[in-house]
Each structure stands twice: as C-alpha cells, then as structure tokens.
A protein has these predicted regions:
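Glycine-rich phosphate-binding loop of nucleotide-binding enzymes
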Residues: 23, 31-38, 385-474
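Glycine- and acidic
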Residues: 13-21, 116, 300-308, 412-420, ...
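An acidic- and aromatic-residue-enriched active-site/binding cleft used to recognize and process polar
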Residues: 16, 49-52, 92-94, 310, ...
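Switch/coupling segment of Walker-type NTPase motor domains
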Residues: 49-51, 56-60, 75-80, 433-524
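Hydrophobic alpha-helical scaffolding
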Residues: 117-120, 124, 274-277, 308, ...
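Beta-sheet entry/capping signal
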Residues: 8-10, 43-47, 86-88, 302-304, ...
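Extended, folded cores of ATP/NTP-driven motor/assembly subunits in large transport
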Residues: 1-375
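Conserved structured core elements
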Residues: 23, 27, 128, 299, ...
Length: 524
C-alpha cells in the first residue's frame, strides 16, 4: 500500500488466548518480536493497532436440531455483552525527513507527496524483502500468526469496508458507513461518538522498570501464577470501546547515539549553570552506556489509548477506567486533549509517517516491545465437535473442542479427563453438561455413578428417546444389580462368548496368585 508517500504492508495478527501463556513463553514471544524488528531498515515504523469493541452475543436458536437444554443455554446468554478483539500490524517505510517532522506539518499542505527515496525501486524492494523476513520470524515463534492483508481488505470494495474505512467509522463491521468528524476546542467527535485520548509519550510518565509479563492476582494463588503481558491492562482487561496504538520508530541508530553524545557534552558545559543540566547529562550517559554495553538499538516509542462513547457521562467513567489501568502499569496517566486530532490522523492505517516526532520518547527495542499486548480474548474452536463453555472474563459462550483438536495439534496424547475441585465446586455439574452435549453429538456414553449425580440426566434422555437411551442401572436392597452370564439372544455360544464365561468363572474361583491347573482349564 502506497499512502502519503510511504509504503505500508498490513497484517492481521492472531495472538495467543489470555491465561494460556507461561512466563517463559512470554519471553519467547518478546524475543521473536525483537528479532523481527531488527531486520527492518532504518526509518521504518512498526505500528500495532489493537481494536476492542463492545458487542452483544447473538444466540444460535435458529437451528432445528437443538435440544431443550441447548436452546435454553442459548437463550440464557442472549445479548450478553463482551469485548471483541481485532489486531492489525502495519509496517511502514518512510523517510528521514518525514520521521523528524513535528505536529505543525502535514502532507495535506504538499503539492507532490512522493519523495525521491520512495520512488527508488531498490529501496522499495529491500523494504518488502525485510517485511517477508519479519513475517517469517514472528510466525516461526509458534505463538503468533500474521496474515498479510490484500488491497481490497485495506481499501475496501463496493460491498465490504476495508480497514481504512473501518477506522474512520470506529467500527469493525464489514458493512459500515462513514461518519462526520467534528473538531472542537475541547473535544473531538466522530459521528455520535466523543473521543478521549490517553498517551504515553514522555519518559517521565513511564514506570522505573518494564517487563514482558506480570502476575494476574485475581486468578493466581500462593502456589500458582496466572500470567498476562505487561500491557494487558490496556487490552482485554479494559472493558470499553477503545483502540490501543503501539508505535516503534526505527531511526538511524548510529546517528541517534552521536546526537546524544553531543547533547551530553552540551549538558556538561552548562552543568555549572544548572543542576538540572548535570542530571540530564548523567541520564544521557546512562542511556549511552546501556546502548554500548549491551548492544541495544536506539528507537523511539509511543503508545496511546483512544476510547469513545456516545454518552458524555459514560465517557467520564471511561476516562477514569483508562487512567486506573495506566496506574496499574505504574505509568502516569496523561489525558491528552490537545493532540487528539493529530494522533487520530497519524493512526490511519498507512499514515504512520505523519506521526508528530515530539510525541515519542527514546528507548530501546526490547523495552519498547514490553508495551505490546500479547494476548487476545478466547476464541471458539474450528472443529465441528465440541462443547459449549463461556469466557471467564465476560461470560460469552464459546464452542470448544477439548478432545479431538488438542489431539490433532499434539497438545495431548489421550482423551482422558481429570476433573479436580473441592466439594461443591461443580464437578458433577460440569460433567453433566459435558456428557449431555457429547451424547447429543452422537457419542456413546457409559458412566459409573456412585452418588446418583447423573440419574436425572439419564431419566430425561430416557423419556426423550422412549426408553431407547438413558438407561440407568442402580442398586437397591430389594432389587440388587444382577445378570445372567449364560444368557444369549439367539442361544448360540460362539468362541468369544465361551471365553468370556471362562474368564468370569476363573475370576470368581481363583485368586490372583493362584493360577488354574491344566486339568481345570480343560474341564472348563
């Protein structure tokens, strides 16, 4: 995609499901991103754009073969709100000139917008080669899947909206309509929606340390950790309509360090006039020492959360929620009211080159990547066989295959299930739910019930099938369980039947450590 003098390659990103990644796996994902970013040429922009849209669950009650319980399940979750996550990755090749521009410059003011660097075929080919390497490195990690978007998926067709049109409409629907954009002194409005923007654009607003992942206290215990990425509070844990933009600007690393060396010398010369100059000089030297000691690459970074609502009162609550989530990351919440139009304009897919340089801060690739969200919401299994479960965060129903699909992917080697929990935690309730759906999909189910937990389910199935299925054998003193091993429907005793009777008699007659003699076997 060629947009505003820049070349952009767009991907749809499939991230791992939340609460399914360990700390070591988060490190592996972070390492894969870092390796991929390093293959990109200078003056590239890595823009990861995560959409989180509130939607309501639509029940599947139109199917004719639904049982009473399945239909009741669907009706119970009708209109259940949940957060739908869509992730895009945009790799943009810009120029040195555009990467340094401030917010007071826009390509809208230029007559000819394609610079000489982009017109060079060799530059374009090298960039496209590096994006292919980027895609391969990230895909080889085994945790993230990148799917390159086509031209129609970016710009849209007469019948379906592309990602650019969706961005202008603040929607992820394929059939959407463009909205009027209104800019006022105090706010920005798109259609009926009011926007609010929180930014991470200054190193002073950042925590003293960043990390790849952290402990999610609500689902962790003293003996086990539930891990989420460092930036997860701005992702699936923020339950409102919002876009989380993450930018990494790759400049000329050598030139950056030379500029910092010059600044350090200037600060040293002015240190006797101000203690602040001396402190700045020490910070710059620490940055340079880190870069030289560990071979780190100097980049610029920016993150922002763009949230919206059509209700002014709800928007106030959203502002507080975003600020609270930033505080959970130990970041200083900064509600930006001045640069909302500029940053919204720079967030258009393909327009990353128009990002205002003063809204970014210098860091290294590894630290910048810690601000990437690395998980998505739970997804339904593609397998036709499975059971209905619900998302533990929002309660949205999901179709999950916990037997065949994990076996096919090599996650498990058998289909055994071990259900563990204290008394009253719902073990029998879940098993009733599981075996009932397995039965409805044609599975033969045999249960040894020691507490009559499944008698009600069997009686219901027995009534539905007219006694064909749902047969329940139980023991009472008046009517103990008994069977005649010598009975056959046709009165014919084949070899298999005779062997089973022989085995039964030996089991009842002999002990485990008392093998039968040859004469006894012949007699039988």
């Amino acid at each position: 995609m060629l947009f505003r003098s820049d070349i952009t390659v767009a991907f749809r990103v499939e991230l791992p499901e939340l609460f399914t990644i360990t700390s070591a796996e988060y490190e592996a994902i972070h390492s894969a991103w870092a390796k991929a970013v390093k293959v990109l040429p200078n003056f590239c922009v890595v823009h990861k754009q995560d959409w989180f849209i509130r939607e309501n669950y639509t029940p599947e009650i139109q199917k004719d073969d639904l049982s009473f319980l399945s239909r009741s399940f669907e009706r119970h979750f009708n209109e259940r709100p949940y957060l739908n996550h869509t992730c895009y990755l945009l790799l943009t090749k810009t120029t040195k000139e555009r990467s340094r521009r401030q917010s007071d410059f826009s390509t809208l003011c230029r007559g000819f917008i394609v610079p000489k660097e982009i017109q060079d075929k060799e530059t374009a080919l090298k960039f496209l080669e590096s994006t292919s390497q980027f895609e391969r490195i990230v895909g080889d990690s085994g945790f993230i899947k990148l799917t390159r978007l086509t031209g129609d998926e970016i710009t849209g067709t007469p019948t379906q909206a592309g990602i650019i049109e969706k961005y202008f409409a603040l929607s992820q629907y394929y059939t959407t309509s463009l909205q009027d954009i209104s800019l006022a002194a105090a706010d920005m409005r798109i259609g009926d929606n009011l926007l609010c923007l929180h930014t991470l654009s200054d190193a002073e607003d950042l925590p003293s340390q960043v990390r790849t992942d952290g402990r999610y206290e609500k689902l962790s215990t003293d003996r086990s950790d539930c891990r989420l990425s460092f930036a997860s509070p701005l992702g699936v844990l923020l339950s409102c309509n919002h876009i989380y933009n993450q930018y990494i600007f790759i400049d000329d690393h050598t030139e950056n360090l030379q500029r910092f060396e010059k600044q350090a010398r200037n600060m040293h010369s002015l240190s006797r006039y101000s203690r602040g100059n001396q402190i700045n000089k020490e910070w710059i030297e620490k940055y340079l020492n880190e870069a030289h000691s560990y071979g780190l690459t100097s980049v610029r970074c920016h993150c922002n959360v763009m949230a919206w609502s059509d209700d002014a009162e709800e928007l106030k609550r959203i502002k507080n929620d975003v600020g609270s989530q930033l505080a959970l990351m130990e970041c200083k919440p900064r509600h930006n009211t001045v640069d909302t139009p500029t940053l919204y304009w720079a967030g258009i897919p393909g327009n990353e080159g128009d990002f205002p340089a003063e809204e970014s801060f210098y860091t290294f690739i590894e630290q910048a990547l810690c601000f990437f969200t690395e998980e998505t919401s739970y997804q339904s299994s593609p397998s036709p066989f499975g059971i209905k479960m619900v998302d533990r965060l929002t309660g949205k129903p999901l179709h999950l295959d916990i037997s065949d699909l994990p076996m096919k992917r090599g996650i498990i080697t058998n289909r055994n299930k071990f259900i563990l929990g204290p008394s009253g935690s719902g073990k029998s309730f879940f098993t009733n739910h599981m075996v009932r759906q397995y039965y409805e999909q044609g599975t033969h189910v045999l249960i040894v019930d020691t507490g009559n937990s499944y008698q009600g389910l069997c009686e219901m199935i027995n009534r539905m099938t007219g006694g064909k299925d749902g047969v329940y054998f139980t023991y009472t003193e008046e009517n103990p369980i008994a069977f005649n091993p010598f009975y056959t429907d046709d009165g014919v005793f084949d070899i298999e039947k005779r062997e089973s009777i022989k085995t039964l008699i030996l089991t009842l007659w002999k002990r485990d450590n008392e093998p039968p003699t040859r004469a006894e076997e012949v007699a039988l």
